[in-house]
Amino acid sequence: MMMQAKAVQRVFILGMDGAGNFVQQAETPNLDVWLPRGSYTFDAKAEMPTISAECWGSVLHGVQPDKHKLNNEKAATLSYPSDSPFPSLFRLVREQQPEAKLASFSSWSPINSGIIEDNLGVHKVSLPDAELVSSLLVYIEENQDVRLLFLQLDEPDGSGHRYGYGDDCPEYLAAITTCDELIGSVLKRLEKLGLMEDSLVVLLTDHGGGGDNKYSHGSAHPMDRDVFWGCIGPGINSGLLKGPVSITDTAAIAALALGLTLTQQWDARLPEGLLDDTWASKSITIVDNKTAAAEESHNG
């Protein structure tokens, strides 16, 4: 049985696309304040290949790309199979908590149309970054009992493709700064509404860029694969994580906080040192073999 030390009422996964770990070189006054409030790292790993569908698919489905089988073309043209053995967090919540409010705000529309399953009653919005966050802020005001909310901002990746990725590309760094402002507005609204006290927030990006190709990504080069990742909330330690972290691990802490039961072994793991000792148990129940999917260790 999974036990929680403190009740988490809602989970927010807030991401920007293609930022890598260049948030360290960009002006990010909001991340600079918020990341240290929880556990964080600038050395998390994106999945391979370091491409959006593969990576966001792993964030939301808890498994590596060879299992969820997503790529950009599939995500843009096909619905994710509703009977897949590797469901998204959204499908798991809907099946196990039928009345839960679910929302996905994604500037890159294939996340809503091809990575998250159809017909789950998820409130889905796809708009340019600034309009998207405006819509999200209205939604939060009116739906403070939302159970799971995902946000993807796209412009760092767009700027990287147009102007180049890296700390020598001012347009790219400026796009990261803009996304920092937008995510900061979400976090400040959550705090103003008093929602941070019983919410879990993950802050992340899916991949970087500029490794093998200044204007693209997809390789295992550190510029493509090394990314920032952070988690804030009840029972989460504060400070730098010293062990390995994968973006896929996002699903493990979300599932643990949401009280979900899995039917398949996940690749997602709880990063070492993430949870404080107020968590009574550090595992997620798997109904088919009764073993823990997310012990507080990471298998790399």
Question: Model-found features: residue ranges?
Answer:
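Second-shell loop/turn segments in exported
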Residues: 17-22, 45-46, 75-81, 123, ...
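Polar, surface-exposed loop/tail segments
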Residues: 260-296
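Substrate-binding rim/cap in mid-to-C-terminal beta-strand-loop elements of soluble/periplasmic
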Residues: 56-60, 218-261
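A substrate-binding/cap region within the structured catalytic cores of diverse enzymes
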Residues: 80-135
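Active-site nucleophile/metal-coordination loop of metallo-enzymes that catalyze phosphate/sulfate
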Residues: 5-10, 20-98
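Loop/turn elements at helix/coil->beta-strand transitions in domains of secreted/extracellular proteins
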Residues: 7-11, 37-41, 96-103, 144-149, ...
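Active-site His/acidic residue clusters
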Residues: 109-123, 137-181, 185
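Metal-dependent active-site segment of extracytoplasmic phospho-/sulfohydrolases and closely related
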Residues: 11-15, 30-31, 178-217, 254
